[in-house]
Every structure is written in structure tokens, then in C-alpha cells.
């Protein structure tokens, strides 16, 4: 390569110009320059793309966690993907902080010296709780025990969010899926601790190899055991003096009733019968935040009678009984028999459309809204040793059950957990079955008989709203005291 300087001898030299004269290797040099140019071009394009992403990410973030059916976004997949990177984790933390902070925006900050929140809950160590207001001090006060049990927390602290991201992430999804709203940030943190403890218990149970059922998180996740029992397990029963109480005018005799509906030559199949497979069960409903299990159990069994005897699907009003049953206590509990008595005295049930369910919202009894009434003539008490017979030939049975707070997170299988001390919940017995299962103690397959029970906690609870409880071939075994009170309504 030769290097030349060009200038005019008659002029003052102002600028030198460089001229490259290519020799034999000029082609390779040109290729090298072109490669450098391409690299620079790609780099510039990449930087431009990064800038474009930076200025548009806020807009994208707004729709990232939407729950719209139109955009088909899978929240679990997105969040799990984000958890794989540090930047993704930080993004989730920022969204959680935005969510938590929003609870304080509509409420004025408490002044210095406001009443301190001591959070008197299980798992909180009073000596570690320095009585720091969650509103006035949004730092520190976050600990997690070695067994992942949250003792106390501060959802405003980024370090806590990062250290407990999995649980906080699950809580965030729980809030979204169940549309949970809390009035204050203190309430939210209280619910987070309860949620964390419930989640821990669920995980510990599902690791067991000797249990026949599984648990799963659901809408009850932010309720303490005491709160769950007070809201959902408040059925009233006649107790041990049931047989000493005066006979109810609408109660029929079992032997007379079974003779009417059971064919003389019938042979009872004690292995399996499921009214869900024979058009005798209506859809699962949800009593929501109201202790109205007694109404759902009694109304559900009446719906089954209309389905079996009239061959038609009717959905009747539980809210009518909650509002108008003078012998029961609305959302604060009731008796199955009183529900049937008042059902008859009121002239029948309204349709669900005419008298819709509003849960725990206050309502005044208003029977004028009913366009048509659907009544029963009487009801019959089922003897302890006749459950399978009555179920097969009469239909689903309104029964009491001694449930415990372990029922709250039942997901599926054969429930073999703890039971309540006494009957406290009303459900519907809709069938029975048998399955061969492996017994680890004996090392062989054994026949396992069970009852199929319809609950009133929504179809997202249990096995589509149902739970399976152990019995025996004759149906005499009553797990969790099922059927201490058992009745079938009669249309004729």
C-alpha cells in the first residue's frame, strides 16, 4: 500500500488529504472493513431494540397480569417463567409492592402514636414482636422459620419479598383468582400469615405416603381454623335427645315409605350406586360467606326428588329459606328438620331465578316475588342401618356430618383426616361405591367402600364439589358421624 500527500505549492497548506492506493492485499482489507461495518450495524439495531423495549415495557407490564379471557394469558406459566431470572423476580416484586401499596392509597396514614398492631396469632412470638405499627414503620420485622413457617412479615420490605418470593407469589395469585379485597394493609399482612400457615400444612400433608386423600389451596386459604369453623360449621342438631322430642307433624314412617318405593322383588346392590349417573343430582352450589348449609342440604335434596320423580331439572331458592324460615337462624345456622317444616308451612319453594341467592347480604322475606311454588308433602328419617337402601330407592339424603377444619382444603381421594367432635355441617349423600386400593400395612389389594357426599362450598372445592368418606359393604360404618340426622323429602 502506498501513501501519497497531495497539495498545491502555490497555496498555503490548510488540510492534508489521505489517499489509499490498493495493492494486492486490498481485497482482504475491504472484506475486513465490511465485517466491522456489519457488526456495528447489528449492534446499533440491538441497542435500538433495547431502547424500544425499555420505553414500551411499562405499557406491556400493565397487561402482563390481566385476567382477560380475550388474551388467553396463562398467569402461572408467565410467573414461573419470570421466577427463573433475577430480573423476572425483581419485576414480580415491583408488581407485588404496587398491589400492597394500593391498599393504603384510599386511606389516610395513621399519625404517630397510633395503636400498634400486635398480631396475636398462632406462630407469632410476642418477645420478637416489638409492637411496631405496620403503617408507621415499613421496614424489618420479617422472619421465616426453618420449616418455612412465616412467624411475622412485612410485605412492604423488598428483602422479605425476595426471600419469600414463592409464598408471596402464591398469595398474589390467590388474591387474583379469588378476587380478594382487604380494607387495610394490616389486614392484608394478617391474611398473608394465615395463608402461609395453611399452605405449609397443605404441603406437609401431601408429602405423606399413608394418607388416602390430597389437599389443595382454595378460597379458604386466608381463613384461620377458628374463622372457618365459625363461618361454615354451624349446623344445629337435636343431639342425643332427638328420640325424646315430640314427633314432627310432617314426618312420615320409614317402613311405610320404603314399601311404596322399593319393588317387592328388588335386590339391593350394596357395591355401588351413584345418583349423579342417573339424573338425580343437581349442580353443586356455593353457600359463600353464610352459615346456610342447612338450607342448601334441604333444598338440594328436594331438587333431587323433583329430578327423580318429575324427570325435570329444577333449581330452587335457598335464599327464601335463609330469609323466611322462622324456625332457623339464617346465616347463623339451622336445623334440617326445621327447614323442611318451614318449607311446607311457607307453601313451597320459589325458583332460584325468582328468589336468587345473595349470601350474607341482609334480605327481608318477600314471597311475593315467586311466580310459582314447588312444595313437598312430608319427609322421612332414615334409620342408621338403612342408608344404602334408602339412598337407592328413595334418593339423595340430607345428612349431618362432624366436619373439621381439615375439610377446608380437601382436594380429592378418600378423606381419612380428622373429624369434628360433633355434627356441625349439613350435606347431601348422593351415592356409594367401592374401589380396590393397595394396603401398605398388609401388602395387598383390598376393597375400599365409600360414600359420595355433595357439599355446598362450590364446584372448585374437593372433587368438583364432592367428598368421599369411608364406609363398609352394608353402609353401617359412618365416618365423621355422617347421618346422625338423615332425612329424605317426599313429594307424595
Swiss-Prot record:
Keywords, ordered alphabetically? Cytoplasmic vesicle, Disulfide bond, Glycoprotein, Hydrolase, Membrane, Protease, Signal-anchor, Thiol protease, Transmembrane, Transmembrane helix, Vacuole, Zymogen
Record-annotated active site? 293, 425, 455
Record: glycosylation sites:
61, 129
Please give the start and end residues of each transmembrane region. Answer: 36-56
User: Which residues are annotated as site, described as Cleavage?
Assistant: 242-243
* Known EC number: 3.4.22.-
One short Pfam name that applies is Inhibitor_I29
Motif stretch (Bipartite vacuolar targeting signal 1):
16-25
| Modes of activity regulation | Inhibited by cysteine protease inhibitor ICP.
InterPro entries (UniProt xref): Papain-like_cys_pep_sf, Pept_cys_AS, Peptidase_C1A, Peptidase_C1A_C, Peptidase_C1A_papain-like, Prot_inhib_I29
Q: Which residues form the propeptide?
A: 1-242
Gene disruption: observed consequences: Lethal at the asexual blood stage.
Q: Which GO terms describe its biological process?
A: hemoglobin catabolic process; proteolysis; proteolysis involved in protein catabolic process
UniProt protein name = Falcipain-3
What is the organism lineage in this UniProt record?
A: Eukaryota, Sar, Alveolata, Apicomplexa, Aconoidasida
- Primary gene name: FP3
Amino acid at each position: 500500500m502506498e501513501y501519497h500527500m497531495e497539495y498545491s505549492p502555490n497555496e498555503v497548506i490548510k488540510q492534508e488529504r489521505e489517499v489509499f492506493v490498493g495493492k494486492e492485499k486490498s481485497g482482504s482489507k475491504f472484506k475486513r472493513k465490511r465485517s466491522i461495518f456489519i457488526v456495528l450495524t447489528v449492534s446499533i439495531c440491538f441497542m435500538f431494540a433495547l431502547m424500544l423495549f425499555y420505553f414500551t415495557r411499562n405499557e406491556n407490564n400493565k397487561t402482563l397480569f390481566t385476567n382477560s379471557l380475550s388474551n388467553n394469558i396463562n398467569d402461572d406459566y408467565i410467573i414461573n417463567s419470570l421466577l427463573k431470572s433475577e430480573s423476572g423476580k425483581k419485576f414480580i416484586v415491583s408488581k407485588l409492592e404496587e398491589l400492597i401499596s394500593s391498599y393504603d392509597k384510599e386511606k389516610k396514614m395513621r399519625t404517630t402514636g397510633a395503636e400498634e398492631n400486635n398480631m396475636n396469632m398462632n406462630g407469632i412470638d410476642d418477645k420478637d414482636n416489638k409492637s411496631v405499627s405496620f403503617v408507621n414503620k415499613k421496614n424489618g420485622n420479617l422472619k421465616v422459620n426453618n420449616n418455612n413457617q412465616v412467624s411475622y412479615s412485612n410485605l412492604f420490605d423488598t428483602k422479605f419479598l425476595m426471600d419469600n418470593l414463592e409464598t408471596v407469589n402464591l398469595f398474589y395469585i390467590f388474591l387474583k383468582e379469588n378476587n380478594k379485597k382487604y380494607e387495610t394493609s394490616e389486614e392484608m399482612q394478617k391474611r398473608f400469615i394465615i395463608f402461609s400457615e395453611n399452605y405449609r400444612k397443605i404441603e406437609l400433608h401431601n408429602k405423606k405416603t399413608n394418607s388416602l386423600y390430597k389437599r389443595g389451596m382454595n378460597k379458604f386459604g386466608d381463613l384461620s381454623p377458628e374463622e372457618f369453623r365459625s363461618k361454615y360449621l354451624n349446623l344445629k342438631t337435636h343431639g342425643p335427645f332427638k328420640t325424646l322430642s315430640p314427633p314432627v307433624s310432617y314426618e312420615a314412617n320409614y317402613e311405610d315409605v320404603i314399601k311404596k318405593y322399593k319393588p317387592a322383588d328388588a335386590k339391593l346392590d350394596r357395591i355401588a350406586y351413584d345418583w349423579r349417573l342417573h339424573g338425580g343430582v343437581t349442580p353443586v352450589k356455593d353457600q359463600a360467606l353464610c352459615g346456610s348449609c342447612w338450607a342448601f342440604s334441604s333444598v338440594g335434596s328436594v331438587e333431587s326428588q323433583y329430578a327423580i320423580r318429575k324427570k325435570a331439572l329444577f333449581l330452587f331458592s335457598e335464599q327464601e329459606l335463609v330469609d323466611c324460615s322462622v324456625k332457623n337462624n339464617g346465616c347463623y345456622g339451622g336445623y334440617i328438620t326445621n327447614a323442611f317444616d318451614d318449607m311446607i308451612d311457607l307453601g313451597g319453594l320459589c325458583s332460584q331465578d325468582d328468589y336468587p341467592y345473595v349470601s350474607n347480604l341482609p334480605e327481608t322475606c318477600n314471597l311475593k316475588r315467586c311466580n310459582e311454588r314447588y312444595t313437598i308433602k312430608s319427609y322421612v328419617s332414615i334409620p342408621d342401618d338403612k342408608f344404602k337402601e334408602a339412598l337407592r330407592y328413595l334418593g339423595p339424603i340430607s345428612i349431618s356430618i362432624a366436619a373439621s377444619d381439615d375439610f377446608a382444603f380437601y382436594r380429592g381421594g378418600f378423606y381419612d383426616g380428622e373429624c369434628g367432635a360433633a355434627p356441625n355441617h349439613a350435606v347431601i349423600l348422593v351415592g356409594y361405591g367401592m374401589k380396590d386400593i393397595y394396603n401398605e400395612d398388609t401388602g395387598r389389594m383390598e376393597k375400599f367402600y365409600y360414600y359420595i357426599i355433595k357439599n355446598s362450598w362450590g364446584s372448585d372445592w374437593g372433587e368438583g364439589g364432592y367428598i368421599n368418606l369411608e364406609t363398609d359393604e352394608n353402609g353401617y360404618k359412618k365416618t365423621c358421624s355422617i347421618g346422625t340426622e338423615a332425612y329424605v323429602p317426599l313429594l307424595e
